């Protein structure tokens, strides 16, 4: 709720994208996300270092559930203040986490 008042420009940009996207495209994208196969095995077998950035207030995918999955496949994770779009909601922290990760690889 707080982000709705502090991020009005970013929210308006997302709304503009949504209202200009044809309904068929929105439905297809939603179904694609819902029906996509589990690709966890791809991450499990990838030998490169991996990082998953999670939003602490994500209402769609609880970070606790994702943290357990990420740890089970040997990935690094960062839990930041923000929701499902944490990279928009907490851009500065996201950039800092990415910079630190890039220094490791």
Regions found by a protein language model. Give the residues of each.
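Hydrophobic "lid"/C-terminal helical patch
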Residues: 30, 94, 98, 102
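Conserved alpha/beta-hydrolase catalytic His-Asp/Glu region
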Residues: 1-47
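A generic structural signal for secondary-structure junctions
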Residues: 1, 19, 71-74, 103
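Generic helix-packing signal
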Residues: 33-34, 70, 86, 98
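Conserved loop-alpha-helix segment in the C-terminal half of the alpha/beta-hydrolase fold
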Residues: 45-83, 88, 93
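Generic structural signal for alpha-helix termini and adjacent loop/cap motifs
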Residues: 36, 104-105
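Residue-level signature of transmembrane alpha-helix interfaces in integral membrane proteins
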Residues: 38, 65, 71, 97-100
């Amino acid at each position: 709720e707080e982000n709705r008042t502090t991020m009005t420009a970013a929210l308006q940009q997302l709304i503009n994208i949504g209202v200009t996207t044809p309904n068929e495209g929105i439905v297809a994208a939603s179904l694609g996300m819902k029906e996509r196969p589990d690709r966890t095995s791809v991450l499990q077998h990838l030998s490169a270092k991996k990082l998953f950035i999670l939003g602490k207030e994500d209402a769609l995918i609880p970070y606790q559930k994702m943290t357990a999955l990420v740890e089970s496949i040997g990935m690094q994770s960062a839990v930041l203040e923000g929701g499902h779009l944490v990279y928009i909601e907490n851009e500065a922290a996201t950039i800092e986490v990415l910079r630190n990760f890039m220094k490791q690889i």
